[in-house]
Amino acid sequence: MLMARQHLSARLHGRRPARHRAVSIVLALGMAGVAVAACSSSSPVAAPHNVTTTTPRPAHTAPSTTTTSRRSTATPSPPATTTPEQPGWTVVSRLPSGIAVDSHSSRRSNGDLVTVLRFHAGLVHYALHVGSIDPPTDGAALPAVARPAIGAREHAQLLAAFNGGFKMGAGCIPCGVGGMEVAGRVLFPLVRGMTSLVLNQSGGASMGVWGQGFPPAGAAVYSVRQTLPPLVSGGRVSPNVGDVSAWGATLGGGLLTARSSVGIDARGNVLYAASMSTLPSDLADALVSAGAVTAMELDINPEWVQADTARSPGGPLRTAVPYQYRPADQYLSGWTRDFVTVLSGP
């Protein structure tokens, strides 16, 4: 498939499009909550709290949601392979307690290759980082595991990192982008009807549509990333997936561009899907094939789509999206936009 010619958009700050044939990527990230790396003494962590929500014009049907809970560490179990090798999947990273990352590749009807990288629930936890420019923090003191660069302590646990959602204030009209909360601080008001990746203070994750039975009453909300209504709801592709304009402005107005997305399956594995030239429907199909129950689009356009993985915690990082613009160590040195880290645990 040839990439559509792309030009600079006034709303999304992308670079020139990739000139290579794009290959789709899906990262499946296991979401059991375990302790996030300790914060620096100079940056106290805010306690989880109730958040304020706003209501956009359209209403959306709530999808099924899946929540992962923190594993008890009071009586550690002996190391055991909790995730056996599966036919058709290749082990990428193995921890003493089991396979943390494995991969599977398939080809879409249009010929594009889709690679699924699966991070297994119970073996990883997560942290949401702000960028140096977006979202604006207004000088809020944030812990080390929420800042624009990955610190040394967090790096020692790092298995993967991937880009966040749309720039705050950008996106489709009238659906809006959504809000964001980081380390207990609401940076942009959270919006009802927007798909939400929610992290608790231990790094456990869940996903659902905000304000439609999600998050459940009493849930400990520590960080939230929202982007658009669901791309996948109840294990089914959104009926609006064919309306490409509803999924963000592309460079030059073409249909094909770099896109990314994140979802969660019934086992609590989190899925990240991306390609440097694709349609929203391609991402949705790949996520559903990988077992996604709920999923949302993340950022689009070539400058912002990025995922990196390591074979072992703290090991050398490799780019996971073929032909992505940014180097594999970009998040280590710091980045302008928000991103999520995937850390080994416990």
Question: Model regions: which residues?
Answer:
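N-terminal export and membrane-targeting signals
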Residues: R5-G30
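C-terminal motif of bacterial Sec signal peptides marking the signal peptidase cleavage site
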Residues: A35-A38
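Bacterial signal peptide processing site
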Residues: S40-S42
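Zymogen propeptides
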Residues: P44, P48-T52, P56-F188
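Conserved hydrophobic/aromatic beta-strand scaffold that supports enzyme active sites
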Residues: V114-R118, S196, P230, S261, ...
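Aspartyl protease catalytic domain
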Residues: L128-S289
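Extended C-terminal subregions enriched in glycine
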Residues: G208, G234, T250-P346
